[in-house]
From Swiss-Prot:
Quaternary assembly: Component of the IFT complex B, at least composed of IFT20, IFT25, IFT27, IFT52, IFT57, IFT74, IFT81, IFT88 and TRAF3IP1. Interacts with IFT25. Interacts with IFT70B. Interacts with RABL2/RABL2A; binding is equal in the presence of GTP or GDP. Interacts with ARL6; recognizes and binds with the GTP-free form of ARL6.
Homology family: Belongs to the small GTPase superfamily. Rab family.
An annotated Gene Ontology molecular function: GTP binding
Function comment: Small GTPase-like component of the intraflagellar transport (IFT) complex B that promotes the exit of the BBSome complex from cilia via its interaction with ARL6. Not involved in entry of the BBSome complex into cilium. Prevents aggregation of GTP-free ARL6. Required for hedgehog signaling. Forms a subcomplex within the IFT complex B with IFT25. Its role in intraflagellar transport is mainly seen in tissues rich in ciliated cells such as kidney and testis. Essential for male fertility, spermiogenesis and sperm flagella formation. Plays a role in the early development of the kidney.
The name this protein goes by in its record: Intraflagellar transport protein 27 homolog
Length: 186
């Protein structure tokens, strides 16, 4: 039984639901806070995620970062050497989706020379009547960037665990591949 630790960067524009997603995941869906204050720096959420069919687990250290450019210099230091990325946008806000490429580029610049596993999460699907980003468009963009794609409604507690379970599985797979490389060298 192996317990791995992974630094997970939670990135995206302000008010897309990053903090709500992290908090609801940490509490296993037990607590949805109706109002949030703007994250002005970085919040840290830690949760252990079992990897199915292995007996192993990944402890995700989820760095919930401010979505404002104002804090970007601070983010550079806090984002150093991430292991996985959770990129969040609001399905009712096309600009938040369009800005995902900027957030992805920023995260990847903090992990030069390595493959950074990640997911794209469209949040606020409960606001279907106000949807501005087509699911197929988001999925195609994510695929083109090497990201898995999910949609969720944190408010309705729908599919909020899947992105993090996927990240844990991706990180565990990288670990297994490295173990195999070392075994081949022995």
């Amino acid at each position: 039984m192996v317990k791995l630790a992974a630094k997970c960067i939670l990135a995206g524009d302000p008010a897309v639901g990053k903090t709500a997603l992290a908090q609801i995941f940490r509490s296993d869906g037990a607590h949805f806070q109706k109002s949030y204050t703007l994250t002005t720096g970085m919040d840290l959420v830690v949760k252990t995620v079992p990897v199915p069919d292995t007996g192993d687990s990944v402890e995700l250290f989820i760095f919930d970062s401010a979505g404002k450019e104002l804090f970007s210099e601070m983010l550079d230091k806090l984002w150093e050497s991430p292991n996985v990325l959770c990129l969040v946008y609001d399905v009712t806000n096309e600009e938040s989706f369009n800005n995902c490429s900027k957030w992805l580029e920023k995260a990847r610049s903090q992990a030069p020379g390595i493959s950074l596993p990640g997911v794209l999460v469209g949040n606020k699907t409960d606001l279907a009547g106000r949807r501005a980003v087509d699911s197929a468009e988001a999925r195609a963009w994510a695929l083109g960037q090497g990201l898995e794609c999910f949609e969720t409604s944190v408010k309705e507690m729908e599919n909020f665990e899947a992105p993090f379970h996927c990240l844990a599985k991706q990180f565990h797979q990288l670990y297994r591949e490295k173990v195999e490389v070392f075994r081949a060298l022995a």
